[in-house]
Amino acid sequence: AEAASVAYWRVHQKYLAKADEHKGVTLVGLTSHGPAVIQTKSPLNSLDDLRGQKIRVPGGVGSSVGKALGVTAVKLPAPKVYEALSTGVADGIFMPMETQKSFRLKEVVPHVTIMPGGLYYGSFAFIMNNDFLAGLSENDRNAIIGVSGEKLSQLAGEHWDAADVDGLAAAKEAGTTINKASAEIRKKYLEIMASVEQDWVAS
């Protein structure tokens, strides 16, 4: 997440800032959570096992990944995932490893499959109200700006990574089965994702 967050900031500054997506507010940082993993109630032996399963997916690229893999998408806000998994509304979820601890998913999804390179990465922006920023003292404003940008992006990514380490430790302690997807599965995954990338580039 740290490397992805720094890369995200640099790419934004070089190529995307000109689009002025954050017009009217001040962008102080960009970050990406750690690599999403596949968390399921039953073991995953191949990507075909995901077809038709009720998987909670996020919006954006995560939703596109789920669609390409043939899952039955369950759209829920993150705070609702534990309940959805514990009551059978969902069979699994695509989220980072840290959620095994932070969302207590170790209690409801005992199987985790790690896709080398990550299933996907979700992005976030840190923004500040311009009026609020203008109302601060010059010293306070400069202090905020001084730790913003790439510094804040890197720090956020660093904390995402640390949370994933904690999540992995909690999962192991709980007896969660953790498997790394084979080279064959990863190859198939990348082949499936080629169309997702093409659609994104074309959009």
Which positions does each model-derived feature cover?
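N-terminal secretory/targeting leader peptides
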Residues: 1-3, 13-203
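Internal glycine-rich flexible loops
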Residues: 10
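Cys/His-rich zinc-coordinating modules
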Residues: 7
